[in-house]
């Protein structure tokens, strides 16, 4: 199942060259590789920090600060719970900024729905930290969230 899920994220990565954010999609693909095929969860979560920064910069209509990539090796020094807190803060900032800056449109609704599904996925992952993980439930939220974020990231009108 992991290979099929990874192929879906790879498809979203390819789709991102059409109207998405290829850098965010590449970081997502890399994060998922670490989370699905290795035991290096800190590396996966560190790449998800970069994903959130890429989306935040898009909403701010600013280029991705290339120096931010140096967060990756530094983040590996932090314990996993601290990385999770940093990720959660960036993700909630992403949601907040998207709700404020994105003008009303069909694309906005799809983008925000993608963020909602992503949040549901992350809450499921957090819940699974205390219980037996349910990968199918995680991917039920994650796969469509990545598709919606990919196809709407560049077309959402921003104030």
Task: Annotate each PLM feature.
Residues 1-159:
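Polytopic alpha-helical membrane-helix bundles and their juxtamembrane interface segments
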């Amino acid at each position: 199942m992991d290979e099929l899920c990874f192929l879906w994220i790879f498809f979203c990565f390819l789709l991102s060259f059409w109207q998405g954010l290829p850098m965010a999609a590449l970081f997502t693909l890399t994060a998922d590789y670490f989370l699905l095929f290795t035991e290096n969860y800190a590396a996966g979560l560190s790449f998800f920090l970069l994903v959130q920064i890429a989306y935040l910069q898009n909403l701010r209509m600013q280029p991705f600060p290339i120096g931010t990539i140096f967060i990756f090796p530094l983040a590996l020094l932090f314990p996993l719970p601290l990385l999770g807190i940093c990720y959660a803060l960036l993700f909630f900032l992403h949601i907040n900024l998207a709700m404020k800056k994105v003008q009303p449109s069909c694309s906005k609704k799809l983008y925000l729905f993608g963020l909602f599904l992503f949040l549901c996925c992350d809450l499921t992952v957090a819940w699974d930290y205390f219980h037996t993980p349910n990968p199918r439930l995680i991917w039920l939220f994650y796969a469509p969230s990545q598709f919606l974020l990919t196809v709407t990231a560049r077309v959402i009108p921003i104030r």
